[in-house]
Every structure is written in C-alpha cells, then in structure tokens.
Amino acid sequence: MKKIPRIGVGGPVGSGKMAIIEAVVPILIKLGYRILVITNDIVTTEDAKHVQRTLKGVLIEDRIVGVETGGCPHTAVREDPSMNLAAVEEMEAKFPDTDLVLLESGGDNLTLTFSPALIDFFIYVIDVAAGDKIPCKNGPGISQSDILVINKTDLAPYVGASLQVMDDDSRMMRGKKPFVFTNCKTNEGIDDLVHLIRENVLFDTEVSKESA
C-alpha cells in the first residue's frame, strides 16, 4: 500500500481550522486530488458534520469522519494519538486511492503539536481577531509548524490589529519557514496555501511550471 501523506491542521478554538480545510479541499479536488478529512471534537462529531454539509457535492460524506476524543485536544493528536491513528488507517484502507489526508485537531493553544507518528506535515492556524501579538508570543505552533496560516485578515480593522506587525513578527519567529495570510470569506490567500501544499506535501511537478 502506498504511503499517503497526512497534514495536521491545528490551532486555537475559533481560529478557522475547519474553514481553511473547507476552502482548500474544493481546489485540490478540482486539480484531481482525492482527499480524506478527519476532524476531532471532545464529545461530538459536529465539525465532521459541518464539513459534510459545506462540501456536499464536492467530497462524498464517506470521505469525512469525526473522532470523539473525550478529552484534551492535544492528547488525542500528540501524547496518545491511537484513536486518530485507527481512524486514519481505517479510512486509508477503505479509500486506498487517496492522495492526501487532512486531519483537524480540536481547538487548543500555542503549545499544540502533532505526533510524528500521526502526521507528516503541520499547518498551524491563528486568527487576526486574537490580536497582532500572537506571532511574537511564539510557541511550537508559531515557530515549528511547516506552514503558519494567519486567518481572518478582514477583522484587522475591527480589533485594531496590524497585519504588518504580524508579518514582521512571523518572519522573525519563523525564519525561512512559510506563512500566509488568509480570508476564507473571499478566498484571499487560499490559492497561495494550496500552492504550498502542492509544492511541499504532494510534490506536484506542475507547481514549478506554473510559477515560471
């Protein structure tokens, strides 16, 4: 069986992890990729149901599953990812033609990371509404994630946040690691995020041709 790449999508409650997934999946599917989505909630599978409703007609419901973790969000994706590993392996066996798995963690804090046994690539999502000081607060999600997504750029003027400050601090904390500003309502930045996924996770040779 081929090794299917897995992306972990983490971040604080309400940062827009699910919205990011719902934005990138249709684009990836249009490009010909076959996707699985796995979500985490503590006592429900509400996120999975939301994704199923939003992506109805785009991604079949059977390719979207929710995991009820019953406890701390980071435990289920880091210290003891057994429930998620079982879900991923079951879905991959059911859909062996899959090209990419997107696994959303439950909402957590700046210390969130994923077990390397569970994922191959880490996207961390923060939102502008939480304030422009978030990048400089650092934490594993800010500095160690493979891609940092700064979501909800449209809210900056309403909360007095400076996107330039967030840009400067992200560069300082992340060095050469990529980050992208997004607005899921207008799809601002989503194409850039998909480009990074294709280039760094799916190793799509067409990306370099498109950039030329």
Curated annotation (Swiss-Prot):
List localization entries.
Cytoplasm
- Gene Ontology terms, cellular component aspect? cytoplasm
Annotated keywords: Chaperone, Cytoplasm, GTP-binding, Nickel insertion, Nucleotide-binding
Gene3D superfamilies in alphabetical order: P-loop containing nucleotide triphosphate hydrolases
Residues that coordinate or bind GTP: G11, P12, V13, G14, S15, G16, K17, M18
* GO biological process, alphabetically ordered: urea catabolic process
- Listed GO MF terms: GTP binding; GTPase activity; nickel cation binding
Q: How does it assemble?
A: Homodimer. UreD, UreF and UreG form a complex that acts as a GTP-hydrolysis-dependent molecular chaperone, activating the urease apoprotein by helping to assemble the nickel containing metallocenter of UreC. The UreE protein probably delivers the nickel.
| Physiological role | Facilitates the functional incorporation of the urease nickel metallocenter. This process requires GTP hydrolysis, probably effectuated by UreG.
By sequence similarity, the record places it as follows: Belongs to the SIMIBI class G3E GTPase family. UreG subfamily.
**What name does UniProt use for this protein?**
Urease accessory protein UreG 2
